Amino acid sequence: VTPLRTKVLRVVAVGATFFASFEFCAPAVKPFLPRDGSQVHLDQLWVDPGDVASRDMVYGPWGRAHAPDPKAVYTFVRSKVHGASPGMTVVDPRGIKWSVKQSTEGPVEVMQSRIFSALGYHQPPVYYLPSFTLKDDKGVHEERGGRFRPSLPEFEEIGDWSWQQNPFVGTKPYQALLVMLLMFNSADLKNSNNSLYEHRRADGTTERL
């Protein structure tokens, strides 16, 4: 028991060192409560997942209803202009806009999202298509697929989420999240890569993801 516990503590320590140094000029790592004085609950970051084996690892927490149609024709809107990964914005026949990330890490991002969700961490809807049909100025043709993230009216992006200063710094779910990112070799922990969403439920209540 003791050797295993020692190993776990070492992993957490390495994670903390890695996290503290991932950005040269990053702010101090500390708990940071909302300026408006609103109460923060741990379940805004993590909830007990219950029976992990029952989780949908194909379509994720938002299910098949929010997934992109692999048989639809997607109309080109614009190319991705931020970041190093290739991609584009497209719109499907239902009028839903999709952010398509076509880099090699696209399917990895979806896989990580499924694992995090299965372990109780909130995740926005993301999906993967190996290819899709695109309509652009070249006509209608097959296009390389990637990570598909929908722009839905019930999900409002309200800003970046800071790794260094948030209400969950120091909690076990937060530390476990860092350890899992180390296991996935996810070193690109820029705050600009993490969006905070407000989800409006059907009953009118809201939650942050």
Task: Give, region by region, the residue ranges found by the protein language model.
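Regulatory N- and C-terminal appendages and interdomain linkers associated
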Residues: 5-12, 18-76, 92
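Intrinsic-disorder/low-complexity loop/linker signature
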Residues: 37, 138-139, 203-204
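Intrinsically disordered regions, especially transient/low-confidence alpha-helical propensity segments
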Residues: 43, 59, 95, 158-160, ...
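Short, solvent-exposed loop/turn and secondary-structure capping segments
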Residues: 58-64, 111-113, 192-197
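Conserved ATP-binding subdomain of kinase catalytic cores across diverse folds
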Residues: 63-164
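Conserved kinase catalytic-core segment
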Residues: 108-109, 159-209
